[in-house]
Curated annotation (Swiss-Prot):
Annotated source species: Erwinia tasmaniensis (strain DSM 17950 / CFBP 7177 / CIP 109463 / NCPPB 4357 / Et1/99)
Membrane-crossing segments per the record: none
Pfam families linked: H2O2_YaaD
Name listed for the protein in its UniProt record: UPF0246 protein ETA_07010
InterPro entries: YaaA
């Protein structure tokens, strides 16, 4: 079972580390190509491209210019501990033990606009480059054209290494669009998390993101390997709904609190 999740815009490079173990990203040579493109952008270009404030644009221009392999624990941080968005609030990797990190390293991957595909313990330097950004590059008009084949190949390799063909898609649509599903040698299962509001169940972004992280945590800490085991997920009040689920989409619902 291989899980994929999205990265986060919010980063943490300051809190204590839950592990000292680290690995190097596999696609750094490709990342360097994007850095070379990004370094040609002015802060004004970055602000326009990413729809961010001038202050954030200056920060990210500095990050592109400061980006420099080789990565070490002194200038980089393990990806699973560096990302701090809603998904990672649910994941709570800062509470993992060493055996949890070992399982996650084999069974979890993070999609990334700059790094392509990251293992949990892969070191990364701070960046902001969302997959949906239309950054023209040597491979085409956007990051989807840059990463598509490379990511799909890397995921197929990861699937082969961990022993089965089961891929659990816990990434956002923006990020999973960077993968070419028809070329994936995998059965793709997508968990969907619905919350009740005014009597109707729907995807509420903040809750759904956190729930994806909770599902990752549940799989990692219970060392799950089968689809049937996922149906027992019950964290934070969610429950599997067999009536609205299908073979490749597992629906979990949470009722509104009275």
């Amino acid at each position: 079972m291989l899980m994929v999740i999205s990265p986060a815009k919010t980063l943490d490079f300051a809190s204590p580390l839950a592990t000292e173990r680290f690995t190097q990203p596999a696609l750094l040579a490709e990342s360097q190509k994007l850095i070379n493109v990004a370094r040609k952008l002015s802060p004004a270009d970055i602000a326009s491209l990413m729809h961010i404030s001038d202050k954030l644009a200056v920060l990210n221009a500095e990050r592109f210019n400061d980006w420099q392999p080789a990565f070490t624990p002194d200038n980089a941080r393990q990806a699973i501990l560096a990302f701090k968005g809603d998904v990672y609030t649910g994941l709570q990797a800062e509470t993992f033990g060493e055996e949890d990190f070992t399982f996650a390293q084999q069974h979890l991957r993070m999609l990334s606009g700059l790094y392509g595909l990251l293992r949990p313990l892969d070191l990364m330097q701070a960046y902001r480059l969302e997959m949906g950004i239309k950054l023209a590059n040597p491979a085409g008009k956007d990051l989807y054209s840059f990463w598509g084949d490379k990511l799909t190949t890397a995921l197929n390799e990861a699937l082969a290494q961990q022993g089965d063909n089961l891929l659990i898609n816990l990434a956002s649509d923006e990020y999973f669009r960077s993968v070419k599903p028809k070329r994936l040698e995998a059965d793709i299962i997508k968990p969907v998390f619905l919350d009740e509001k005014n009597g109707k169940f729907k995807v509420i972004s903040f809750y759904a993101k956190k729930a994806r992280g909770l599902m990752c945590r549940y799989i990692i800490q219970n060392r799950l390997t089968k689809v049937e085991q996922l149906k027992k997920f019950d964290l934070d009040g969610y429950a599997f709904d067999g009536d609205t689920s299908s073979n490749n989409e597992l629906v979990f619902k949470r009722r509104e609190m009275a």
